[in-house]
Curated annotation (Swiss-Prot):
Protein source organism: Homo sapiens (Human)
Disulfide bonds: none
Coiled coil, from the record: 271-353
Stated name of the protein: Syntabulin
Lineage, broadest ranks: Eukaryota, Metazoa, Chordata, Craniata, Vertebrata
Known tissue expression: Isoform 3, isoform 4 and isoform 5 are expressed in HeLa cell line (at protein level). Isoform 3 is expressed in fetal and adult brain. Isoform 4 is expressed in numerous fetal tissues (brain, kidney, liver, lung, and thymus) and in adult brain, kidney, liver, lung, pancreas, colon, prostate, small intestine, testis and thymus. Isoform 5 is expressed in fetal brain, brain and small intestine.
Job of this protein: Part of a kinesin motor-adapter complex that is critical for the anterograde axonal transport of active zone components and contributes to activity-dependent presynaptic assembly during neuronal development.
Length: 663
């Protein structure tokens, strides 16, 4: 039974070394030193082994210390990273092999082996079972601390992870411990191998195995620790060990299959891991804050750009609306200007029509003036012929007063006038616009002619003496005064046979009272009385109009002769022409009126009337000056008022000059 006991001892030593190697966790609960505990718990009397065998379990012995593997070697076997121990500040003490913390292997194979060899357990197994019993209470504390440490973000080393150590360390520890066990087995081969174990040790060993193999301790301890340790990769890979392992060992529990090697951070303490995580989180927070600031700055910039774009858009909209309003106003103004242009065109067209009518009227008047000039030339030639006819001697004064030559002349003039009016009518037919104006003008002339004919009827109703007073007659040669004629020249008058018959009848009635009136004034001058009919006929011939379109009608006039004092109220509807002639003596002693000088007379027969006519227009000017020019620097008179004042002062001399003879 020597070899069998040796193999069992080797197995126990290997199991103990495996427990010692698996007891390396970052959070270690240190127990009292191993030699003291051995002396207290296991006395030498109870140990069935020899001192040499018991020295094998003492790590302080020279042989054991020489043959045991250091903690660094376990660390290098467990992780495959020999430099990891220098990183971690928590280190196992040099007597780590004496640590009472031990774990039962989580395999059914080890449990069956323990069952088979339970009757042959020596003192070393009793000590290991006691150590296991004491480590039973220590299993909870590392588990709780591992659970607390596993709450960190980076993941720490938990108790189940240390419990699930690699098989390479077991193989190496068992292979390295074979030497002393071989020597001790050889020394202790004489010991009785069939020493019975106490029932107390059997109960303790069975309880410890049950507790460690129960699913409450093993499997749930792996379950919660695996997600926390998965971050740091605390599971050790099976390929990191330099020693070949038996694959059948891990078939039942499924440890470390395809797990990545751990990160170096898992060898830090939890405080350092927390510091690292805090540092990482701070850097991430700084980066996120920096990104947040960048995004906020971008948002602010985009908001400002959006505000600028809004302002620009609003400004553009305002400009567009203003442009539209300006366009509407411009269109309205264009329409108004078009309307104004249309109205101006229409008004100018009307004015052009009026101006054309004015030009037509001017052309008609020019043609009429030309016809008047031609008729005047013809009448002048006819009057010369009539003067030659008046030179024959007359038998009686009644016969001398015959008006046949002047009537013949007038008839000739009327015939010429009819021709001219016919030509004028033909011209008026050519111009249709001037018909209305011509008819209005003719109506005015006819009214004026009817008034003049009324004056002639008044002349006819007066007695013969008054009629003779109306005629300009030379009563004596001693006064040396000049007879003044006054006649009214009308405008273009279309004569009719009734008017000519009226004039002939008036002149025939004037022939009867002539002899009686001639004899009464002065009987001492028969020559002048005899020559009076000739002078009267000459006067009548002189009153024949040169223009066939005009008629010269007699009107009363004041004469400077002393015996003729009658005041005449003439009809002043038409323009007056004053004719003055110089005295010419003929061969027969008759003094007719010549046609030399023409004097215009603007004064009436009364001095007061002329004074009022000159001075009355000055009164409104003076009143206006006194009412508006008070305290002003402008003069209170104008040139018109000044001239009228001068005329008032020299009115007497001005009235006399009209009756002077101008040769």
């Amino acid at each position: 039974m020597g070899p069998l006991r040796e193999s069992k001892k080797e197995h126990r030593v290997q199991h103990h070394d495996k427990e010692i190697s698996r007891s390396r966790i970052p959070r270690l609960i240190l127990r009292p030193h191993m030699p003291q505990q051995q002396h207290k718990v296991s006395p030498a009397s109870e140990s069935p082994f020899s001192e040499e065998e018991s020295r094998e379990f003492n790590p302080s012995s020279s042989g054991r210390s020489a043959r045991t593997v250091s903690s660094n070697s376990f660390c290098s076997d467990d992780t495959g990273c020999p430099s990891s121990q220098s990183v971690s500040p928590v280190k196992t003490p040099s007597d780590a092999g004496n640590s009472p913390i031990g774990f039962c292997p989580g395999s059914d194979e080890g449990f069956t082996r323990k069952k088979c060899t339970i009757g042959m357990v020596g003192e070393g197994s009793i000590q290991s079972s006691r150590y296991k019993k004491e480590s039973k209470s220590g299993l909870v504390k590392p588990g709780s601390e591992a659970d607390f440490s596993s709450s960190s973000s980076t993941g720490s080393i938990s108790a189940p992870e240390v419990h699930m150590s690699t098989a390479g360390s077991k193989r190496s520890s068992s292979s390295r411990n074979r030497g002393p066990h071989g020597r001790s087995n050889g020394a202790s081969s004489h010991k009785p191998g069939s020493s019975p174990s106490s029932p107390r040790e059997k109960d303790l060993l069975s309880m410890l195995c049950r507790n460690q193999l129960s699913p409450v301790n093993i499997h749930p301890s792996y379950a919660p620790s695996s997600p926390s340790s998965s971050n740091s990769g605390s599971y050790k890979g099976s390929d990191c060990s330099p020693i070949m392992r038996r694959s059948g060992r891990y078939m039942s529990c499924g440890e470390n299959h395809g797990v990545r090697p751990p990160n170096p951070e898992q060898y830090l303490t939890p405080l350092q891991q927390k510091e690292v995580t805090v540092r990482h989180l701070k850097t991430k927070l700084k980066e996120s804050e920096r990104r947040l600031h960048e995004r906020e700055s971008e948002i602010v910039e985009l908001k400002s750009q959006l505000a600028r774009m809004r302002e620009d858009w609003i400004e553009e909209e305002c400009h567009r609306v203003e442009a539209q309003l300006a366009l509407k106003e411009a269109r309205k103004e264009i329409k108004q200007l078009k309307q104004v242009i249309e109205t101006m065109r229409s008004s100018l067209a009307d004015k052009d029509k009026g101006i054309q009518k004015y030009f037509v009227d001017i052309n008609i008047q020019n043609k009429k003036l030309e016809s008047l000039l031609q008729s005047m030339e013809m009448a002048h030639s006819g009057s010369l012929r009539d003067e030659l006819c008046l030179d024959f001697p007359c038998d009686s004064p009644e016969k001398s007063l015959t008006l046949n030559p002047p009537l013949d002349t007038m008839a000739d003039g009327l015939s010429l006038e009819e021709q001219v009016t016919g030509e004028g009518a033909d011209r008026e037919l050519l111009v249709g616009d001037s018909i209305a104006n011509s008819t209005d003008l003719f109506d005015e002339i006819v009214t004026a002619t009817t008034t003049e004919s009324g004056d002639l009827e008044l002349v006819h109703s007066t007695p013969g003496a008054n009629v003779l007073e109306l005629l300009p007659i030379v009563m004596g040669q001693e006064e040396g005064s000049v007879v003044v004629e006054r006649a009214v020249q009308t405008d273009v008058v279309p004569y009719s046979p009734a008017i000519s018959e009226l004039i002939q009848s008036v002149l025939q009635k004037l022939q009867d009272p002539c002899p009686s009136s001639l004899a009464s004034p002065d009987e001492s001058e028969p020559d002048s009385m005899e020559s009076f009919p000739e002078s009267l006929s000459a006067l009548v011939v002189d009153l024949t109009p040169r223009n066939p379109n005009s008629a010269i009608l007699l009107s009363p006039v004041e004469t400077p002769y002393a015996n003729v004092d009658a005041e005449v109220h003439a009809n002043r509807l038409m323009r007056e022409l004053d004719f003055a002639a110089c005295v010419e003596e003929r061969l027969d002693g008759v003094i007719p009126l010549a046609r030399g000088g023409v004097v215009r007379q603007y004064w009436s027969s009364s001095f007061l009337v002329d004074l009022l006519a000159v001075a009355a227009p000055v009164v409104p000017t003076v009143l206006w000056a006194f009412s508006t020019q008070r305290g002003g620097t402008d003069p209170v008179y104008n040139i018109g008022a000044l001239l009228r004042g001068c005329c008032v002062v020299a009115l007497h001399s001005l009235r006399r000059t009209a009756f002077r003879i101008k040769t």
